[in-house]
């Protein structure tokens, strides 16, 4: 895949091909790590049902903690990539922005992971600890041939707008500089400003799905705009697993990301 021409580690390349579409060279990832931060949310109370639905809808990978591997493995049907999330923190913690490492790259390998991910809140009071974790774990990932996804979110006392193009660009570049192969970050809200974010980051960027949107059309238009701005894909959780038609919305996203269809056409995938 052309976007990974700079990666010479054959193990990473083989695993990246499992979570990216080989034809479009894009990806649709469904994060399901919310149970740790927010508890048993509607839509992921049964992770196997959620995993089955997004796999049937065409998603390239699911992302979650260790429990997703044990309780969400489908064991049949269409294969789907597995990304093990290594960071944890809760909404009821005294410092919700602090993320700690709760597993190892080696453990993720034993679980059959195709990639690992870390969460970094850029601007948090403990951000320096998360930077250190990212930098050191990137070295372990390189050793084992494990792709590393860095969730780089501008969050903290000095961050007035988490979608401000300047801070999003800084967060994305920071993740790439510290060794991440793929960056997940906020969409800035318009094509031109996000083009600048993509241009300033040497690693491919996938956009976060963000808060649950009011309409399917609004959400899918954001996906369409992000792809036109140069995004390498989408990593959306609540807008997918809390949808009335999980399979349908997943399929609609995949149509836009992989086939570049218009939003109106993609909406036809949603049956409920």
Swiss-Prot record:
Entry's EC annotation = 2.2.1.10
Q: Which GO terms describe its biological process?
A: amino acid biosynthetic process; aromatic amino acid family biosynthetic process
Which amino acids does the record list as binding 1-deoxy-D-threo-hexo-2,5-diulose 6-phosphate? 33-37, 153-155, 209-210, 237-238
Q: Which InterPro entries match?
A: ADH_synthase, Aldolase_TIM, DeoC/FbaB/LacD_aldolase, DeoC/FbaB_aldolase, FbaB-like
The terms under GO molecular function for this entry are: fructose-bisphosphate aldolase activity; hydro-lyase activity; transketolase or transaldolase activity
| Superkingdom as given in the UniProt entry | Archaea
The chemistry this enzyme catalyses reads: 1-deoxy-D-threo-hexo-2,5-diulose 6-phosphate + L-aspartate 4-semialdehyde = 2,3-dioxopropyl phosphate + 2-amino-2,3,7-trideoxy-D-lyxo-hept-6-ulosonate
- Record's SMART domains? DeoC (SM01133)
Coiled coil regions, renumbered to chain: none
Keyword line? Amino-acid biosynthesis, Aromatic amino acid biosynthesis, Schiff base, Transferase
Could you name the active-site residues? 33 (proton acceptor), 153 (proton donor), 184 (schiff-base intermediate with substrate)
HAMAP family, per database record: ADH_synthase
Report the PANTHER family cross-referenced here.
Answer: 3-HYDROXY-5-PHOSPHONOOXYPENTANE-2,4-DIONE THIOLASE (PTHR47916:SF1), FRUCTOSE-BISPHOSPHATE ALDOLASE CLASS 1 (PTHR47916)
**Assembly with partners or alone:** Homodecamer.
Q: What does this protein do?
A: Catalyzes a transaldol reaction between 6-deoxy-5-ketofructose 1-phosphate (DKFP) and L-aspartate semialdehyde (ASA) with an elimination of hydroxypyruvaldehyde phosphate to yield 2-amino-3,7-dideoxy-D-threo-hept-6-ulosonate (ADH). Plays a key role in an alternative pathway of the biosynthesis of 3-dehydroquinate (DHQ), which is involved in the canonical pathway for the biosynthesis of aromatic amino acids.
UniProt record similarity statement: Belongs to the DeoC/FbaB aldolase family. ADHS subfamily.
What is this protein's record name? 2-amino-3,7-dideoxy-D-threo-hept-6-ulosonate synthase
Q: Point out the gene that encodes the protein.
A: aroA'
């Amino acid at each position: 895949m052309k976007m990974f021409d700079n990666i010479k580690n054959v193990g990473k390349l083989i695993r990246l091909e499992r979570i990216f579409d080989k034809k479009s060279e894009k990806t649709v990832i469904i994060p399901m790590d919310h149970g740790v931060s927010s508890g048993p949310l509607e839509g992921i109370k049964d992770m196997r049902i959620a995993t089955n639905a997004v796999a049937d809808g065409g998603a390239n990978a699911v992302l979650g903690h260790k429990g997703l591997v044990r309780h969400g493995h489908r064991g049949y049907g269409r294969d789907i990539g597995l990304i093990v999330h290594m960071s944890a923190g809760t909404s009821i913690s005294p410092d919700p922005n602090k993320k700690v490492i709760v597993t190892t790259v080696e453990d993720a390998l034993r679980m059959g992971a195709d990639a690992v991910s870390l969460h970094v809140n850029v601007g948090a009071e403990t951000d320096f600890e998360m930077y250190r974790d990212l930098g050191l774990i990137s070295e372990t990932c390189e050793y084992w041939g494990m792709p590393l996804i860095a969730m780089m979110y501008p969050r903290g006392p000095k961050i007035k707008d988490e979608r401000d193009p300047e801070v999003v660009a800084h967060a994305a570049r920071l993740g790439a500089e510290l060794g991440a192969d793929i960056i997940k970050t906020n969409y800035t809200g318009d094509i031109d400003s996000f083009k600048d974010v993509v241009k300033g980051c040497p690693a491919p960027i996938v956009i976060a799905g963000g808060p649950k949107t009011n309409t399917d059309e609004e959400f899918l238009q954001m996906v369409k705009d992000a792809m036109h701005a140069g995004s390498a894909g989408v990593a959306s959780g609540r807008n997918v697993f809390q949808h009335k038609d999980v399979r349908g919305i997943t399929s609609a996203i995949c149509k836009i990301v992989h086939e570049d269809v218009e939003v109106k056409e993609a909406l036809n995938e949603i049956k409920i």
